[in-house]
Amino acid sequence: MIAELVSSALGLALYLNTLSADFCYDDSRAIKTNQDLLPETPWTHIFYNDFWGTLLTHSGSHKSYRPLCTLSFRLNHAIGGLNPWSYHLVNVLLHAAVTGLFTRFSKALLGDGYWTFMAGLMFASHPIHTEAVAGIVGRADVGASLFFLLSLLCYIKHCSTRGYSARTWGWFLGTGLCAGCSMLWKEQGVTVLAVSAVYDVFVFHRLKMKQILPTIYKRKNLSLFLSISLLTFWGTCLLGARLYWMGNKPPSFSNSDNPAADSDSLLARTLTFLYLPTKNLWLLLCPDTLSFDWSMDAVPLLKTVCDWRNLHTVAFYSGLLLLAYCGLKNPSLEGECNGKALTNGKQNANGHSCHSDVEYRNSEMKPSFASKVENGIKNCVPQRTQLPSTENIVILSLSLLIIPFIPATNLFFYVGFVIAERVLYIPSMGFCLLITVGARALYVKVQKRFLKSLVFYATATLIVFYGVKTAIRNGDWQNEEMLYRSGIKVNPAKAWGNLGNVLKSQSKISEAESAYRNALFYRSNMADMLYNLGLLLQENSRFAEALHYYKLAIGSRPTLASAYLNTGIILMNQGKTEEARRTFLKCSEIPDENLKDPHAHKSSVTSCLYNLGKLYHEQGRYEEALSVYREAIQKMPRHFAPQSLYNMMGEAYMRLSKLPEAEHWYMESLRSKTDHIPAHLTYGKLLALTGRKSEAEKFFLKAIELDPTKGNCYMHYGQFLLEESRLTEAAEMAKKAAELDNTEFDVVFNAAHMLRQASLNEAAEKYYDLAARLRPNYPAALMNLGAILHLNGRLQKAEANYLRALQLKPDDVITQSNLRKLWNIMEKQGLKTSKT
């Protein structure tokens, strides 16, 4: 028990520095924006959606079905909201628990001694686990490992009690249930059933390959046959249910996720897929270079047989075959053991035990004997199974290393990554056992005390180095900026692009732009990076450049709805209404099939329709606007905030004088967001129009209360007061509005108009002048400034503004009439005019 506690304590201690870490990388989509974690989402949705919140049967789903992990995230969210501390705490505790269970499992193979201790400490400290433990989404791998080990330990108990206790099938039931739970944490958990079969055949029964079929069908080995058959049946059921639940279709991924899968060359695909397990093993052996992402060109394709990395592949598979051969070549010392207690494969008889080299190497746990007397002769009857031989442990370790890794090899279907460090969490158990049993064999082999000490201190040093590397790597996972900077040398395109997002969120605009451009230098066709750079430029009023990058993004990925959306908004603001209309329409017609994030796509499509409706609204095409708004309501995803859309529906109905319908949609807007200020203002106008003055005033005042710094609220309230002939109050509201939003033309212009209506002409002149400076080429602003100057007796300035307005709009009848009246006054006063 001491080994388990110490190993767990080390696993806990090494990851304590992750408790202060933030959400990083995939955590954002799996937790921060995952609607399945929210209390308003029915919890049953977890069992129909994938890990990222997309419907599992959707063509764009990653098919990653991990409901128990998502359920744990939801519990975290219910208790602590989006405080990352609690999420990290659960991950660390799970890792400590897995470490303890792995040490307990190792004890069943290695005995209660130094080598079990070494295996546990190595697993606790291995740096390959940092992504799984420090990254919150890695909880799927850690949770799957927990139930993987529980299932395996239950099966070991089943084997040891088979034929002696009725409870043996209770242990088998535990094996099946834990295997199912492991699969519901992460898909590879189901492979524990295959590992259990390997344990039963090669470790517990110590069969070699050619003995399996003849032995398993013998009557006395019926229990072995039954166990293996049930494991196979249950595994088939789990896999069948899993495939059915995801719609019997494999997931689809982009070229950048797994470039080899998209390669046209069969040779390149074959050589690369054969090489990748070699690269994964190297990460286990020497986890010096780790990265948050290994997609894109992080591992260049092997395109020819002359690529020197093929030597690594040959060496890897040769070593693997050699290990397997060494583990399986020795003949079984007892082929038909039927689970009986063994000492070195032979039943102990007449009280004598045989100590071969194999037994010596496993002498940490000796069999216990109970005395019983038969015919006056005292015999010793073995009570428990002797520890497995080194060869047996090698076979089991290889199965632990290889079988859980098989789903990630692209053997049965293409996966959405090149290398994923967290996928190695379960296979690392086999690796740690292999290293431990190898060190133990070397320790036994050498005779000199100095060499034995060298083996001992070398393994201890390795564990120390692993622990130090883990602590350092945890520092990279403290926040996204540190994580992405650490990944630049491995995957520069992805790392620079993600770093640009972080720098932009920190308002480091020039650094963010530089990061985006660096990402595009390494990979120029990344649609997301082109879009992000365009968005950055748009937000900094560099509209021509932004349009250029949006068009490049659309060219790289024609289904990128958000790029169409922002392109249309820029065109609409530039007055290019027909181009904007075509862009919005094209966006609205893009289907959501095979898209990585269908929720984000639907949101962008809904926003495109909303803006198209606004465009029609501004053109006075209210019926068309309503039709587009209805389509937007039909297409919007459940997480879309609909208050602005509902409010615009109300506006359109109000312009069509359909007041009951308008009131309905204003109320819908307020129901969806009770503090939505535009709905308070528009509904207030409707109430005033229908004679409910006191109610209207309450809504205007509520809007001001919600945001006292918003000039538009004072403007609408002032307009209401003006219509009620409360001129003094209206004038105060107008001044307040113009002071707060002195850069907003509409607010300033309307304030000036209200002050003029309140006969406060001097104040009105001040704001008409400001409005004309905000829009120097807007005829109405110049005409109104001319009119107030005319009223205030500043005739020559009034003439100049009238003339400028007529240059911009020569056929304006009101301006022409005002100018003629002005000239008459100027002539009467003997002032020079520009009439001639």
UniProtKB/Swiss-Prot annotation:
Residues 99-107, 154-168, 205-220, 334-392, 444-449 are cytoplasmic. Residues 22-77, 129-132, 242-312, 416-422, 471-836 are extracellular. GO terms for biological process: calcium ion homeostasis; protein O-linked mannosylation. It catalyses: a di-trans,poly-cis-dolichyl beta-D-mannosyl phosphate + L-seryl-[protein] = 3-O-(alpha-D-mannosyl)-L-seryl-[protein] + a di-trans,poly-cis-dolichyl phosphate + H(+); a di-trans,poly-cis-dolichyl beta-D-mannosyl phosphate + L-threonyl-[protein] = 3-O-(alpha-D-mannosyl)-L-threonyl-[protein] + a di-trans,poly-cis-dolichyl phosphate + H(+). InterPro entries: TMTC_DUF1736, TMTC_O-mannosyltransferase, TPR-like_helical_dom_sf, TPR_rpt. The keyword Transferase applies. Pathway: Protein modification; protein glycosylation. One of its GO terms (molecular function) is dolichyl-phosphate-mannose-protein mannosyltransferase activity. GO terms for cellular component: endoplasmic reticulum membrane. TPR repeats lie at residues 493-526, 527-560, 561-594, 606-639, 643-676, 677-710, 711-744, 745-778, 779-812. Keywords: Endoplasmic reticulum, Membrane, Repeat, TPR repeat, Transferase, Transmembrane, Transmembrane helix. It is a multi-pass membrane protein. SMART domains: TPR. Belongs to the TMTC family. Transfers mannosyl residues to the hydroxyl group of serine or threonine residues. The 4 members of the TMTC family are O-mannosyl-transferases dedicated primarily to the cadherin superfamily, each member seems to have a distinct role in decorating the cadherin domains with O-linked mannose glycans at specific regions. Also acts as O-mannosyl-transferase on other proteins such as PDIA3. This is Protein O-mannosyl-transferase TMTC2. It comes from Mus musculus (Mouse).
